[in-house]
Amino acid sequence: MLGAYLPILVLVAIAVIFGLCSLVFSSLIGQKKPSVVKLAPYECGCEPVGSARERFSVKFYIIAMLFILFDIEAVFLYPWSVLFKRLGMFGVMEMGVFIVILFVGYIYVWKKGALEWE
């Protein structure tokens, strides 16, 4: 039973060993000369404007949550589409209810004005 998982275990062990060796060798061999320029934040080749400790609008978080919901929707729709023919009418009805609930949620968010920027 465990023999089937042996290749995966070996692959994980090799990945962990490689990662740890990379960290150890880079800390031993790498240069340790910090300077003001090296410690400055880097932003797309431009000088950073303002502080990184600013507050963000709640709208950004709402959009992020909607994006996560969209990703979860895609995660549920993909296996359903792969097994579409095997699930039969019950699977179609179940996914239809799921899509309707999501659609109602998106309409609610839209009507509340969460997607509008002012």
Curated annotation (Swiss-Prot):
Keyword Cell inner membrane assigned: yes
Any one annotated GO CC term? NADH dehydrogenase complex
What residue ranges are annotated as transmembrane? Answer: 5-25, 60-80, 87-107
Compartments in which it is found = Cell inner membrane
Record's catalysed reaction(s)? a quinone + NADH + 5 H(+)(in) = a quinol + NAD(+) + 4 H(+)(out)
**What does the record give as the function of this protein?**
NDH-1 shuttles electrons from NADH, via FMN and iron-sulfur (Fe-S) centers, to quinones in the respiratory chain. The immediate electron acceptor for the enzyme in this species is believed to be ubiquinone. Couples the redox reaction to proton translocation (for every two electrons transferred, four hydrogen ions are translocated across the cytoplasmic membrane), and thus conserves the redox energy in a proton gradient.
- Write out the entry's keywords from A to Z: Cell inner membrane, Cell membrane, Membrane, NAD, Quinone, Translocase, Transmembrane, Transmembrane helix, Transport, Ubiquinone
* PANTHER family named among the record's database cross-references: NADH-QUINONE OXIDOREDUCTASE SUBUNIT A, NADH-UBIQUINONE OXIDOREDUCTASE CHAIN 3
Lineage per the UniProt record:
Bacteria, Pseudomonadati, Thermodesulfobacteriota, Desulfuromonadia, Geobacterales
Q: Which HAMAP family match?
A: NDH1_NuoA
Q: Which InterPro entries match?
A: NAD(P)H_OxRDtase_bac/plastid, NADH_UbQ/plastoQ_OxRdtase_su3, NDAH_ubi_oxred_su3_sf
Q: What class of enzyme is it?
A: translocase
Principal place where this protein is found? membrane
Cited Pfam families: Oxidored_q4
The Gene Ontology terms for molecular function here are: NADH dehydrogenase (ubiquinone) activity; NADH:ubiquinone reductase (non-electrogenic) activity; quinone binding
This chain belongs to the protein called NADH-quinone oxidoreductase subunit A 2
**The family this protein is said to belong to:** Belongs to the complex I subunit 3 family.
Q: Record keywords: Transmembrane helix included?
A: yes
Give the record's membrane topology: Multi-pass membrane protein
